[in-house]
Structure formats: structure tokens, C-alpha cells
Amino acid sequence: VTGYSQGGAVALGVTRMIEENYHQENEWSVRKLYAGAGPYDPAGTYLFSMERNEMGIPAAIPLIVMGLNDAYDLGFTLDEFFLEPLLSNYEDWVGSKEYTVGQINQLMGSTIMSELMTEDALTLDSPQADMLYEVLLWNSNVGYDLQAPAYFLHSLEDEVVPLLNSINLEEQMPDKEEKTFDFDYYGSHMEASVPFVQYVYQDL
């Protein structure tokens, strides 16, 4: 199972699902997991982005907030989380599904959290932010006891997915046997995908 960026987090999640639900019945098994620069720790990323007041992929903000709102029926309203111009244009930019993530990033016009989200959304003591944080914790794979051999790569220069995702994953992984964590200067988030793919190709 392999994936990079969001695909890396999905690859880990799929591996976990297989191990927890299908492995014992010998229906499916994972020979090896390859995951690069994934947002494995969404709650940690939320806190990190609030502290820095910046989000590498601003489009992730409405996609994550309202995606979780719909999935868990949290009752969030747009004005509890978003400022203009995102607030008035959410249905067009995001709800219509007519725009790519890159286009939504451009339309939002900023990577500064305080220019995109309300004060309550950026204050963990508020009911909205507290609930969002709890749901992000539910969706984390950090701390999962991964059984399959695995290779994780993350560039120390990654400007999109914070390195803390991979660091927290490594530090809280119960069994590190046959797990390789490759943290090095591989360039930007996009540039680091090249050595990741090269490693996967050579290892296979």
C-alpha cells in the first residue's frame, strides 16, 4: 500500500483498516506500507497551524471543517468558522465541486489563518474549536500499533504538511520493528515526492 501527502495518510488508514478487520480472517494482508509526508496527526496539525497562524494548503480548512461537520453531524455553521470572502463564496468555491484544491487556494487569497477563520475557530477554549479538535483526534492514526513493515519519508523542508506529523507518528508507534522513518533535506513538499517514488520503485 503506498501514498504520498494526503495519500500517505490514506495509505496508513487503509492498512489499519485491513489489519483490524480483515487480517485475522486471512482475507487481506499488507506486505509493506509506503507513506510519504502524510497528515497523520490532524489534531496536531490544527494546533501547529494555529500557533504559526498559517496553513500550507488553505483549501484544506473548509474541506476538513465542513467535511467533518457533515460526517459527524456536528451542527457547525459557516459563520462560526469562516471569514469573508470564503464565507460568502463557500457554496461556489467548495460546495459546487467545480474547483481544484489549487484553484480554491488562489480564490481564498491567503495562507494566514486569522484572515480565513473566525477568532472562535482559532481559540481552543471555544466550543467550536474544542469540538473540531476532538473530532480531529478521533481521525488520527498516531499511536496505532502498525503490524506491517513500513517506510515513511518526510522532508525536513516540507512547507505544506508539517514534519510534526511524521515525528509524532514515529514517537508514538508502539512497535518500531521493521519501520523505517526517513527524515532528510529532500526539498519542498512536492520535490520530496520524487525520492519517495524512487525508493518505492527500487524497493519493489
Regions found by a protein language model. Give the residues of each.
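Structured segments of extracytoplasmic/periplasmic soluble domains
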Residues: V14-N21, G36, N139, Q172, ...
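Short beta-strand/loop motif that positions the catalytic acidic residue
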Residues: L146, Y151-D158
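Acidic catalytic loop of the alpha/beta-hydrolase fold
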Residues: P42, L156-P162
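Accessory cap/linker subdomain of secreted extracellular hydrolases
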Residues: G36-G143
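Primarily recognizes the serine-hydrolase "nucleophile elbow" in alpha/beta-hydrolase
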Residues: V1-G56
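Surface-exposed acidic, glycine-flexible loop patches that form ligand/cofactor-binding
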Residues: Y22-E27, L137-L146
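C-terminal catalytic histidine-bearing segment of alpha/beta-hydrolase fold enzymes
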Residues: L47, Q128, Y133-V135, V160, ...
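Loop/turn elements at helix/coil->beta-strand transitions in domains of secreted/extracellular proteins
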Residues: E27-K32, L146-P149, D175-K179
